Amino acid sequence: MWIGIISLFPEMFKAITDFGVTGRAVKQDLLQIQCWNPRDFTFDKHKTVDDRPYGGGPGMLMMVQPLRDAIHAAKQAAKAEDGVEAKVIYLSPQGRKLDQQGVKTLASNQKLILICGRYEGVDERLIQTEVDEEWSIGDYVLTGGELPAMTLIDAVARFVPGVLGKQASADEDSFATGLLDCPHYTRPEMLDGIPVPEVLMSGHHENIRKWRLEQSLERTWLRRPELLDSLALTDEQRVLLAKIKKQHKIS
């Protein structure tokens, strides 16, 4: 997968390219990341990248010309190798909220260009003419789009073939099935007087599967019950959920 990044602070993306699972994916050429800094497309000695908004008000906007030129350079680079164009994403609090289904959808693209805003944002006309989709990571405001872009990259990279040691790691994550993940345990068997659940020590794979499913359902019902509203539960899941609700009603 190829990802182009438009950012005034490309150095921040070393957190993605140099460390962990994504860093290994970059080294193995499973994930290719290139950055374009709008400052490199300025013509004045101060490398100005901000401008005043029409109508006044606090703050500045990203200057149109350097940002647009950086976007065009990234688009050309994306298309140069095989003619495939990249989908252009603007990270914005006004965008569609990123969830696991959205991550899967974005991961189906061969190429993405991520625009990281700064200041008070970018000219609306650039969004209309250069951007395909706007995405948000939540209902809050950050100082820039770099951290949302890194969040998106990290989430999307997990669905690139070969990035994870086992694809099941992605398939069994929280939200992968629409449910929260079940609890997990490792050694020691006893920690501060709390044992590992016996079923996980039994070696009985079917019982372990059912226990994990029940735990996932219980956690989802207790912590994020709204997630269940959009799920088409299986017969097994409905029976387990009824059991869970009955147990909590009794207790």
UniProtKB/Swiss-Prot annotation:
Major site of localization recorded for this protein: cytoplasm
GO biological process: tRNA N1-guanine methylation
Tree of life domain: Bacteria
GO cellular component: cytosol
Subunit structure: Homodimer.
E.C. numbers: 2.1.1.228
Presence of the UniProt keyword Transferase in the record: yes
Similarity-based family: Belongs to the RNA methyltransferase TrmD family.
Subcellular location: Cytoplasm
Protein name (database record): tRNA (guanine-N(1)-)-methyltransferase
Signal peptide region: none
Gene3D superfamilies in the record: 3.40.1280.10, tRNA(m1g37)methyltransferase, domain 2
Leading EC class: transferase
Binding annotation for S-adenosyl-L-methionine: 117, 137-142
Gene label: trmD
Role, per record: Specifically methylates guanosine-37 in various tRNAs.
A Pfam family annotated for this UniProt entry: tRNA_m1G_MT
Keywords for this protein: Cytoplasm, Methyltransferase, S-adenosyl-L-methionine, Transferase, tRNA processing
Annotated catalysed reactions: guanosine(37) in tRNA + S-adenosyl-L-methionine = N(1)-methylguanosine(37) in tRNA + S-adenosyl-L-homocysteine + H(+)
Gene Ontology molecular-function annotations: tRNA (guanine(37)-N1)-methyltransferase activity
Record has S-adenosyl-L-methionine as a keyword: yes
